[in-house]
Amino acid sequence: MDPSENVFKYETAYDLLVRLGAERLFLRTCLSILDPVLELHPGKCYEIDGDLGVGKTQICYSFAAKFLQTKKTAKMGWIGATPLRTDHLLLHIEHFGNQTNEDILDRIVCKRVEKIAELQDSLTRFLDTINLQLVIVENIDAILHDTVYHKEMGRSMQSDVVERIRKLTKLEITVILTNHITHWRGYPAPALGAFWSSQINNRFFIEKRNDDSDIRIVSAMKGEQDDGMNRIEFKIGDRGLKAVE
């Protein structure tokens, strides 16, 4: 054998676990058929994009429910302009039945924010939260809406928020954002402008099959790894996500 053909590639223990698909390493929803697309790695930031009412928050509830049931002692943070609907979240976890509702809710740190400064402060405070492994920011477009119209100042504010998110991911905390889609360019694009979009490497898109359908389609665009734009259909039922029959 030609020695030149022996190529050794450096691989960390984390890289090995990712390659082997270690079950507890990934964050998934409660609906296993979505795993090929919605499979999140720790220490990364993901954005879920879609029109209003398409089911972005329901996806987040499902991620949160699975996380809280599989990570028995871990905490998560929830940031949003409106209060977390714990009644909706509990619908997603009822079929597990492994923990009481009080156990679940005690491990959620909620922050209601309406201003950019409040978002910045909340992200920074999460850095000091013990055993925090997941942060969800609902409707970040509503919180950062004004940054789109302030050009350089707005970009500076967006950069500051991105940097605070990166500090969280460096601690192996997974961050999930939801953002709505705009159509003013003539095609669907994430809100908050081109600069914000350029800062998010891992992105999911949720849409309805058509205007009259209750079937949703989720697809993934993860940085350089396109994987042919995997697309999976699902529905949103009374107790969470469900497969299309």
Swiss-Prot record:
SUPFAM superfamilies, alphabetized: P-loop containing nucleoside triphosphate hydrolases (SSF52540)
Chief location of this protein within or outside the cell: nucleus
Organism superkingdom: Eukaryota
Keyword terms: DNA damage, DNA recombination, DNA repair, DNA-binding, Meiosis, Nucleus
PROSITE patterns: RECA_2
Gene Ontology CC terms, in alphabetical order: DNA recombinase mediator complex; microtubule organizing center; Rad51B-Rad51C-Rad51D-XRCC2 complex; replication fork
InterPro entries: HRR_RAD51_Paralog, P-loop_NTPase, RecA_ATP-bd
GO term, biological process aspect, one: DNA recombinase assembly
Record keyword Nucleus present: yes
Location relative to the cell: Nucleus
GO MF terms, alphabetically ordered: ATP binding; ATP-dependent activity, acting on DNA; ATP-dependent DNA damage sensor activity; ATPase binding; single-stranded DNA binding
Description of how the protein assembles with itself and partners: Interacts with brc-2 and rad-51.
Task of the protein: Has a role in the homologous recombination repair (HRR) of genomic DNA during meiosis. Required for rad-51 recruitment onto ssDNA gaps generated at stalled replication fork barriers.
Protein name: RAD51-like protein 1
Species of provenance: Caenorhabditis elegans
Highest classification ranks of the organism: Eukaryota, Metazoa, Ecdysozoa, Nematoda, Chromadorea
Gene responsible for this protein: rfs-1
